[in-house]
Amino acid sequence: MFPMVTEFMNYGQQTVRAARYIGQGFMITLSHANRLPVTIQYPYEKLITSERFRGRIHFEFDKCIACEVCVRVCPIDLPVVDWKLETDIRKKRLLNYSIDFGICIFCGNCVEYCPTNCLSMTEEYELSTYDRHELNYTQIALGRLPMSIIDDYTIRTILNLPEIKT
């Protein structure tokens, strides 16, 4: 008779445990019910990126001293720096600077270690093209400042999503 009672007690404990697990899952589901959807209508609405967002690299040709620190700290040796040594002034003169964003991993090492701060990260993240060769940006394309999302009048920006008050 006692084995039957212990089996009935185990069955009761398992039932209570299962009900508790179902209740925990249901509470998590209910906690998410008050939140607004995370998805946005992408081409027409854009989220404002954070200050530390690592987007396309901006390059200032006049500040660059062709020291090639960016190439040495890049984990994939990506920036291509062409320079010529000016013998009369004993300095390097930058001829060409390019970065292939099809290969870039956007780690930000080049920006962090640049001694003259000629490199910076922008908030531009729309770099998609139909041809991968168009992702190879020269100093002219790198020097172009992107239009700020905040200043774009055709797009509704989402600064802070309003919360539902209960």
UniProtKB/Swiss-Prot annotation:
Gene Ontology molecular-function annotations: 4 iron, 4 sulfur cluster binding; iron ion binding; NADH dehydrogenase (ubiquinone) activity; quinone binding
Cofactor binding note from Swiss-Prot or TrEMBL: Binds 2 [4Fe-4S] clusters per subunit.
Cross-referenced Pfam families: Fer4
Keyword Repeat belongs to the record: yes
Keywords annotated in UniProt: 4Fe-4S, Chloroplast, Iron, Iron-sulfur, Membrane, Metal-binding, NAD, NADP, Plastid, Plastoquinone, Quinone, Repeat, Thylakoid, Translocase
Binding site for [4Fe-4S] cluster 2: C74, C104, C107, C110
Membrane topology summary: Peripheral membrane protein
The keyword NADP appears for this protein: yes
InterPro entries in UniProt: 4Fe4S_Fe-S-bd, 4Fe4S_Fe_S_CS, NADH_quinone_OxRdtase_chainI, NDHI
Cofactor requirement: [4Fe-4S] cluster
EC id: 7.1.1.-
Top-level division of the source organism's lineage: Eukaryota
Catalytic activity: a plastoquinone + NADH + (n+1) H(+)(in) = a plastoquinol + NAD(+) + n H(+)(out); a plastoquinone + NADPH + (n+1) H(+)(in) = a plastoquinol + NADP(+) + n H(+)(out)
Subcellular location: Plastid, Chloroplast thylakoid membrane
Domain 4Fe-4S ferredoxin-type: 55-84, 95-124
Root EC class: translocase
GO cellular component: chloroplast thylakoid membrane
Database matches in Gene3D superfamilies: 3.30.70.3270
Binding site for [4Fe-4S] cluster 1: C64, C67, C70, C114
UniProt record similarity statement: Belongs to the complex I 23 kDa subunit family.
Role summary: NDH shuttles electrons from NAD(P)H:plastoquinone, via FMN and iron-sulfur (Fe-S) centers, to quinones in the photosynthetic chain and possibly in a chloroplast respiratory chain. The immediate electron acceptor for the enzyme in this species is believed to be plastoquinone. Couples the redox reaction to proton translocation, and thus conserves the redox energy in a proton gradient.
Binding partners and assembly: NDH is composed of at least 16 different subunits, 5 of which are encoded in the nucleus.
Protein name: NAD(P)H-quinone oxidoreductase subunit I, chloroplastic
Provenance organism: Melampodium leucanthum (Black foot daisy)
